[in-house]
């Protein structure tokens, strides 16, 4: 199959491109490189630079390539930024989805696996979170992704565009061979921030909030390795290719780790002291997000290979140690 990966120069997208290629698929990457890295794209994939909000761009690519399915990562994803500039998120994320679905419908592309988020659940009433639990986002990022899910549902009803929405939690780690990894500007994810401090490329770590109703007062999150997540997207494509109905799946390890536990695991893996200070809570951050991934395990046959936080951090540390400047393409 020829699979178009939108946002394929980004962190999760670039790992998914590699896994798709390893599975023998033909891969096309579309990315505007606002946050992605050209160097992260496997040279075996055909690359097109452009924006998913640009219908003319999508039409050109879909005319040139015979696309069998789409994996869609192209979105802004920083919660605090979404609180300050919600329209940016609705324009890019939700608006981009509308343009994409219009192009898919025009060119007869009937399958899409979409990167949703645990942020659609908001502050959960129970943990672990199930797919049937209420979706009440506490920030515009989560709201923009929930709107995307709803738009896809009605596009399925009207046009028969089949989708899988993968709702995932905190993603971490890097390709085990160290070829690609996480490199955001600015970096907002706790694992790379901690490892940048360990590597000496960042001066200190601030943990946001130590008064949450958790075991040590810091946020608790479910961590999934980026390669396990990439594999989930491939399984979701196979699920759609088999003619199954549209659905949503949680992808997570089902284990919660607090920010302090992540810090201590990183200290153990790196052998560095990694100084940290406590700061106030960030707006829009739920206290605990842990996934029930039973549905993905039962229906997709998904099983994480990296369910140990030390192993996840080891792969991330291998990337950061060998690439202290990331891809080295940002001034």
Curated annotation (Swiss-Prot):
This protein's UniProt keywords: Carbohydrate metabolism, Galactose metabolism, Isomerase, NAD
Active site: 141
Keyword Thylakoid belongs to the record: no
Name of the gene this protein is made from: galE
Catalyzed reactions per annotation: UDP-alpha-D-glucose = UDP-alpha-D-galactose
Record-linked CDD domains: UDP_G4E_1_SDR_e
Residues that bind NAD(+): 11-12, 31-36, 51-52, 73-77, 92, 117, 141, 145, 169
Record GO biological process: galactose catabolic process via UDP-galactose, Leloir pathway
Annotated positions binding substrate: 117, 141, 170, 189-190, 206-208, 221, 282-285
Source organism phylogeny: Bacteria, Bacillati, Bacillota, Bacilli, Lactobacillales
Necessary cofactors: NAD(+)
GO molecular function, one term: UDP-glucose 4-epimerase activity
Pathway: Carbohydrate metabolism; galactose metabolism
Protein name as it appears in the record: UDP-glucose 4-epimerase
Source domain of life: Bacteria
EC code: 5.1.3.2
Family statement: Belongs to the NAD(P)-dependent epimerase/dehydratase family.
One Pfam short name: Epimerase
Subunit annotation: Homodimer.
The keyword Isomerase belongs to this UniProt entry's keyword annotation: yes
Species: Lacticaseibacillus casei (Lactobacillus casei)
InterPro entries: Epimerase_deHydtase (IPR001509), NAD(P)-bd_dom_sf (IPR036291), UDP_G4E (IPR005886)
Matches recorded under SUPFAM superfamilies: NAD(P)-binding Rossmann-fold domains
């Amino acid at each position: 199959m020829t699979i178009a990966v939108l946002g394929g120069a980004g962190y999760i997208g670039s790992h998914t491109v590699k896994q798709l290629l390893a599975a023998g698929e033909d891969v096309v990457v579309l990315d505007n490189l606002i946050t992605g890295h050209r160097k992260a794209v496997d040279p075996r994939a055909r690359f097109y630079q452009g924006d998913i909000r640009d219908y003319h761009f999508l039409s050109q690519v879909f005319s040139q390539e015979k696309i069998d399915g789409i994996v869609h990562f192209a979105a802004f994803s920083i919660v605090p930024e979404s609180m300050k500039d919600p329209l940016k998120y609705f324009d890019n994320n939700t608006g981009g989805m509308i343009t994409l679905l219009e192009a898919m419908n025009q060119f007869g592309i009937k399958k899409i696996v979409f990167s949703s988020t645990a942020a659609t659940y908001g502050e959960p009433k129970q943990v672990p979170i199930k797919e049937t639990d209420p979706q009440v986002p506490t920030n515009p990022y989560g709201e923009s992704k929930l709107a995307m899910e709803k738009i896809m549902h009605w596009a399925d009803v009207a046009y028969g565009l089949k989708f899988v929405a993968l709702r995932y939690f905190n993603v971490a780690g890097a390709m085990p061979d160290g070829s690609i990894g996480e490199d955001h500007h600015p970096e907002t994810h706790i694992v790379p921030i901690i490892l940048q401090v360990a590597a000496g490329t960042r001066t200190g770590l601030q943990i946001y909030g130590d008064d949450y109703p958790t075991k040590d007062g810091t946020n608790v999150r479910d961590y999934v390795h980026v390669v396990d997540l990439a594999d989930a997207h491939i399984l979701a494509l196979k699920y759609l290719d088999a003619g199954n109905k549209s659905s949503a799946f949680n992808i997570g390890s089902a284990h919660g780790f607090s920010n302090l536990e992540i810090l201590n695991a990183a200290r153990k893996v790196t052998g560095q002291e990694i100084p940290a200070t406590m700061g106030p809570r960030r707006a829009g951050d739920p206290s605990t997000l842990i996934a029930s991934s039973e549905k993905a395990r039962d229906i997709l046959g998904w099983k994480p290979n990296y369910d140990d936080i030390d192993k996840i951090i080891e792969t991330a540390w291998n990337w950061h140690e060998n690439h202290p400047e990331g891809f080295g393409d940002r001034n």
